[in-house]
Amino acid sequence: MSNQATSEIKFVIVIATYYRKDGLTLKYLTRCLESVKKQTYTNWVVYLIGDEYENTDEFNKFATLIDTNKIIIHNKPDPERKHILDKSRLWNIAGASAMNYGLNLARSNGEKYYVHLDDDDFWESKHLENLYQAYQNYSNCIFAYTKSTYPYAHVVPNKILPREDIKSIFPNNLLPRNSNLIHSSVSFRCDIIPFDYHTTHNVSEIKGPSDAIMWDTIRQFILSNPAYCCIFIPEVTCRHDEEGSIKN
């Protein structure tokens, strides 16, 4: 098992979060962080980015759930929700500026291996182990992801994304594309992939979900740069059992 903290592959786990007035963030984020602590692969650090988290005492307490040398927290002001008042449109870009803050902090700190985790999602214990194996076995891999649960059977009948029944692992066995993967299942080389998540304060500039735009952009980047590849790992290691709470 490749769980040595001395491995050169160190994952930066960026989690953007906000204060839900129904109190559910405490439940969600505690579960989320507990799943990180249970990872069999242990060379990681959490960047917990508050999207103007209003309850600052609660936000600061989240840092106590992880060893102090394994977490960096920052509460970022000026979230998208202050500018985009249509919740159905806000859902497309909510938290993108907080994610970009974490992503670019990782880049400025010289980190290479970005991993995303939504605060209301969580991982099975071997999620990072699987991503590590992808990077370890394929040195030209710059994007890796796994299977994930999905909550709506009327959209995805077996409630698993991606939809394809891929069983073998090889370079570009399943390139990313919008609406076919879950954000929290993803990792990429942030030192090679230069893009940020699309965000705006102008409702007329919302082009679609920020992560979906990112996947299509990265797909084209990989196709245009054949020295690099994507690795899809056909194992369910990500739990995305609900979504769209910001619309409610």
Swiss-Prot record:
Superkingdom of the organism of origin: Viruses
InterPro entries referenced in this protein's UniProt entry, alphabetically: Glyco_trans_2-like, Nucleotide-diphossugar_trans
Enzyme Commission designation: 2.4.-.-
Record keywords, A-Z: Glycosyltransferase, Transferase
Molecular function terms, GO-annotated: glycosyltransferase activity
Family: Belongs to the glycosyltransferase 2 family.
Protein name: Uncharacterized glycosyltransferase R139
Provenance organism: Acanthamoeba polyphaga mimivirus
